[in-house]
Amino acid sequence: MRLILLGAPGAGKGTQATFICQKYGIPQISTGDMLRAAVKAGTPLGIEAKKVMDAGGLVSDDLIINLVKERIAQSDCAAGFLFDGFPRTIPQADAMKAAGVKLDYVLEIDVPFDAIIERMSGRRSHAASGRTYHVKFNPPKVAGVDDVTGEPLIQRDDDKEETVKKRLEVYSAQTRPLVDYYSNWAKAEPAAAPKYRAISGTGGVDEITARAFAALAG
């Protein structure tokens, strides 16, 4: 099972990636983890990437694709892999296609933006313990305070509505076009292209997992 998981920030990709990887016995690969591992291992590509990053530059798509090819050739990818957050742009998808990286599925977890904003901007946390709440879905017993200590809850900067909206704007501009890219490729070249599947990411976690497994079985 070789697949790409697509979806906006806050769509629940991380949760579903864990379940999919457990079911199929495959590793979850993110470019950040992959870069860090290559740098730590001191591979030729890792050394090259470190030079770029140390100079404050962005690692090129060509280098990322070479790292991807190196990573998926490792033994833990024998049964497949799940790409999380990659490719992020059309040029990366094109480069992956040109490099002959074979994929079975592209699975999109689709959640309306207003639901994502509600999901993320409603989160509150207790800084000292890491306990998390949600003003609507999992509220504390007393609004704004931690159930255990009675200390005030905070809203992380990442969860503030304006931050969430900015991240969704970046996703719309850069990554959302991949949905059309892969769905159009699947229609044009069904034999060569990965199967494109979209599921709703709203509802309970178990419900969404069942949808994901059903989509990957067909």
Curated annotation (Swiss-Prot):
GO terms for molecular function: adenylate kinase activity; ATP binding. AMP binds at T31, R36, G57, L58, V59, G85, F86, P87, R88, Q92, R156, R167. CDD domains: ADK. Keywords: ATP-binding, Cytoplasm, Kinase, Nucleotide biosynthesis, Nucleotide-binding, Transferase. Coiled coil: none annotated. Pfam families: ADK, ADK_lid. HAMAP family: Adenylate_kinase_Adk. Consists of three domains, a large central CORE domain and two small peripheral domains, NMPbind and LID, which undergo movements during catalysis. The LID domain closes over the site of phosphoryl transfer upon ATP binding. Assembling and dissambling the active center during each catalytic cycle provides an effective means to prevent ATP hydrolysis. Monomer. PANTHER family: NUCLEOTIDE KINASE. This is Adenylate kinase. The gene is adk.
